[in-house]
Amino acid sequence: MNSDQENINSYNFESIKIGDYKCNVNRIPGDNLYLLSNFNDAEPKYDDKNGVHLEFNYKKIGESKTMRLNDGATSTVLIEGARNMNANEYFPKFVEKKKSFAEHLIRKTFAKGYESPSEIQALVVPELIQRKDTLIQFKSGTGKTHAFLFGCLWGFDPDDDVLQYIFITSSHEVATQIYEQAVFLLPETAKIALCIGQKKSPNSFGNSGFKTPIGTSSLNHKPKSIKEEREEIRQAQIIICTMGRFYDILCNKGWITTTRYLKAICVDEFDNIVASKTKQRSSTVMNTEDQMAEIIQKIESEAPKNSENGAQRVFFSATVSPYAIKIANSYFRKYSPIIGEPFIVLLDSEDYTLEGIRQYYVQCSNYFEKKEIILDLLKQCRIAQAIIFANRIETANEIKKLLDEQEVPISSAVFHGDLPAVTRKNIHKDFVENKIRLLISTDLTSRGLDVQGINVVFNFDMPDTLETYIHRVGRSGRYGRKGVSISLILVNQNKNEMEKVEQIDNCSKQSKMSQLPGDLSTLL
């Protein structure tokens, strides 16, 4: 952990290694660290000695650990007459009801293809089940989406019609991926709303020839009128959304009746949302950091006055800046015996980049040489699927034009934030389904895009920050697969981007950048 990360100096951090990852985890001295070795162990049990608990069986070492569930975890379901029950009456009923849902969640997890928990899932799921506030930094492509969905939604009650969970992320495409995974995991009766911005279509006409009001969100992948959209949001048990759109429906439109019974607010790509260096498009639009602060404030103001729980705060990101750590600390709930200390995981500062990804660079003297080299690389590399990253929309468009003019035989599309939402959605869908093999993209796809077929990432332009580089590179080599990144480095009298190569190498003990070899036949 570096000196900047240590600005949370009130916590005790312990250095641990889980799998191939070295992490710094805050622990109270003497407190147990529970690791989920099998998803079946998330099924709750009850006995007089341990109360409601999870039993973790570590077959490899022939040991087991019992994690007693706290009051926050055991208050996540509606049970008729619960107020008049004592603990011996309530807990067996809780376990009976929660066990049924947990079995469903576990069964769907196996059906999704997860045979055993990944490192991040093993580390984080037990703490999320205990409803701990969390700040989790872990590398891309390690299963973090399933970690926060499984851990948070363990507390979901299908019979409770109130808004229980909010999942926020930074882009339409990532929100859609989270939504689709949540729909797969949960019972069909669960009311889940996908709430993302969508430009109005100029060709939407009713039978009379006049334009029909269309909601600016896409709920359940179907166009909705504003009235239909508002009603679905009001009835939702779970909302999965982009930051700006959620702020609009909560703070501006007031479509969410109450957050009083909210169990958790989970923010993916937290660092990007609260510490983004992206300039605002308009001075009249709040940045996402200010929107996040107002959302947290509103949730706190609506929480029951006599409640020690409140909404759990869950923050995930592949990179975490010192400023994001400071903001997360200010959002965490105040300590109480029920809530406990927040659970914070920070990667070792000297090993941020993904293992399994071979990183190469090619020196270029100017923009025109870059264009020649990218054409050569596309002809020589055996590409399953790939992304070419550019820093500007204009550059992305020029690359696409170049590929079309040169008739490069790889299906491709340009992808950036100025495209209409429907166009972005269709391109994203075609890329996921491998109908498009190559995206020429701005940093819109650098975070959270989960396409397992990507085996190479090209940096046509080097990004401005190390964090963005890490996110870009993380699009390949997903879930332990092998991947390659190739960066075009400008070296001339005016600019020497080899300094960025040195910075990348300084932040990774095991994975270094090297000059691209002449023979690319064995590269992929």
From Swiss-Prot:
Which EC number applies? Answer: 3.6.4.13
Stored Gene3D superfamilies? P-loop containing nucleotide triphosphate hydrolases
As its record notes, the protein acts as a catalyst of: ATP + H2O = ADP + phosphate + H(+)
Name the Gene Ontology molecular function terms of this record: ATP binding; ATP hydrolysis activity; nucleic acid binding; RNA helicase activity
The alphabetized UniProt keywords are: ATP-binding, Helicase, Hydrolase, Nucleotide-binding
Enumerate the spans annotated as Helicase C-terminal domain.
373-524
Family, per the entry? Belongs to the DEAD box helicase family. eIF4A subfamily.
Briefly state the protein's biological role. Putative ATP-dependent RNA helicase.
Q: What is this protein called?
A: Putative ATP-dependent RNA helicase R458
- Tell me the organism: Acanthamoeba polyphaga mimivirus
